[in-house]
């Protein structure tokens, strides 16, 4: 008795034909069945393999059927948008591996050089050509295989990975600005210096800059360009409503990296103690804030509009010249080529408190330009007087644009000059008069762009 039964001679069931269904009823029935099966498999794939699946189907009536493993709909739309923009990062994607790699030195040829790579694999169904000897009747049965192709895309950098640079907020009403030179003591700054290539002619601003810079307001000896600063043409200074004395800001470390260049103890006894001012910007030390327009009058400290000094700066008349001095002489005094110093004699200088001229009369003028009498800086832009206890300071800042670092006398130490070394005619009740100090306001050797002289009455 033969234990092994003979092989079955019954023909095997033919493979299912994959062809277009012409009958509308059968087509709708097959669509519903296959659609539910596809969605079921997509759900199983998302649960078993931690995959995010979105299935989108358009039927013959152009109706859309969508399944998403991500809920709610916003996450589904975000997933589709990621694919359209290629805004995702694939973990260690491998490119086409070359089997003929001679050594390990060429492994980087098939690995991505850029870490931010989006890998997209596209699948397609193609007929299988394995049965080349099949009869014509067998060709009616579809034999296909699934093939895939992978492409790599460089993804855009996200905002969180961008290098954080301190932004500069500019109000809408401020339309015109002047580029200011950088201080040589500034370190680690990301703000570009004044516009222009200072190779041969430092007084010619760059044509690509959108800001107007008066050539006479730039000093070639005081304009510096840092090696580590990105080259950008548009430099907009930081606007601050209040000026504080150097070293008095509570958040000094966050606002500037400027250090003192000289110690108060190292200064000679004949020179008053000097404090340095800054503008609360990381790239500017000793520069000035903006002053109002000549036609706007006095600014209320509570008002927000601040108009910088524009191209009409050269048309401002000097405030301290005698009335009988003609306009031609005024221009000669303040010509950039004429180094003549302006001499202003206050008739009652010795009677002024603390040796300072009245706030509305004292103006610090550079050789580049002068300020008009009605161009008075608002009080909120003056020195913060709360930190000075010995001798309060009251000074205005009408025309400091165009100068770089300026050291001003903010505190007078009368005890620093022994009275025994001063002639008797310059002592009043044993105390030196103000005329002893008045010529020491500005160090002309350090800052040649500021030209001021005072004579005792």
Curated annotation (Swiss-Prot):
Xref: InterPro entries: MADS-box/MEF2_TF, SRF-like_MADS-box, TF_MADSbox, TF_MADSbox_sf
Sorted UniProt keywords: Activator, Cell cycle, Cell division, DNA-binding, Mitosis, Nucleus, Phosphoprotein, Transcription, Transcription regulation
A biological process from GO: cell division
Highest taxon listed in the record's lineage: Eukaryota
Annotated GO CC locations: cytosol; M/G1 phase-specific MADS box-forkhead transcription factor complex
Database matches in Pfam families: SRF-TF
Protein name: MADS-box transcription factor 1
Organism this protein belongs to: Schizosaccharomyces pombe (strain 972 / ATCC 24843)
Gene assigned in the entry: mbx1
């Amino acid at each position: 008795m033969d234990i092994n039964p003979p092989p079955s001679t019954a023909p095997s069931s033919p493979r299912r034909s994959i062809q277009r269904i012409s009958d509308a009823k059968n087509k709708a029935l097959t669509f519903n069945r296959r659609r539910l099966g596809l969605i079921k498999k997509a759900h199983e794939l998302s649960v078993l393999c931690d995959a995010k699946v979105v299935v989108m189907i358009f039927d013959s009536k152009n109706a859309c059927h969508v399944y998403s493993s991500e809920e709610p709909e916003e996450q589904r739309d975000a997933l589709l948008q990621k694919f359209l923009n290629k805004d995702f990062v694939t973990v260690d994607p491998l490119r086409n591996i070359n089997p003929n790699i001679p050594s390990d030195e060429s492994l980087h040829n098939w690995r991505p050089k850029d870490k931010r790579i989006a890998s997209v694999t596209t699948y397609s169904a193609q007929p299988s050509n394995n049965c080349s000897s099949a009869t014509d009747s067998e060709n009616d049965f579809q034999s296909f295989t699934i093939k895939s192709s992978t492409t790599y895309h460089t993804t855009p950098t996200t905002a969180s990975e961008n290098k954080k640079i301190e932004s500069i907020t500019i109000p809408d009403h401020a339309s015109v600005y002047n580029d200011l030179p950088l201080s040589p003591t500034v370190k680690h700054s990301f703000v570009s210096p004044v516009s222009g290539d200072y190779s041969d002619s430092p007084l010619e601003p760059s044509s690509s800059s959108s800001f107007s810079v008066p050539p006479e307001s730039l000093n070639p000896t005081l304009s510096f360009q840092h090696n580590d600063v990105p080259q950008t043409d548009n430099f907009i200074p930081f606007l601050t409503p209040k000026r504080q004395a150097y070293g008095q800001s509570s958040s000094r470390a966050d606002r500037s990296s400027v250090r003192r260049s000289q110690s108060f103890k190292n200064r000679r006894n004949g020179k008053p103690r000097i404090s340095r001012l800054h503008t609360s910007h990381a790239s500017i030390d000793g520069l000035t804030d903006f002053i109002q327009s000549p036609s706007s009058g006095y600014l209320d400290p509570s008002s927000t509009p601040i108009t910088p000094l524009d191209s009409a700066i050269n048309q401002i008349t000097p405030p301290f010249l005698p009335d009988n001095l003609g306009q031609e002489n005024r221009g000669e005094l303040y010509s950039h080529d004429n180094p003549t110093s302006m001499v202003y004699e206050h008739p009652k200088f010795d009677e002024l408190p603390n040796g300072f001229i009245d706030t509305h009369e004292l103006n610090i003028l550079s050789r580049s330009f002068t300020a008009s009498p009605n161009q008075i800086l608002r009080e909120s832009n003056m020195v913060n007087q709360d930190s000075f206890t010995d001798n309060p300071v009251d000074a205005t800042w009408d025309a400091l644009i165009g100068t770089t670092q300026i050291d001003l006398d903010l505190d007078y130490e009368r005890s620093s000059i022994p009275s025994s070394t001063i002639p008797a005619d310059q002592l009043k009740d044993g105390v030196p008069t103000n005329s002893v100090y008045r010529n020491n306001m500005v160090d002309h050797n350090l800052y040649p762009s500021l030209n001021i002289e005072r004579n005792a009455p």
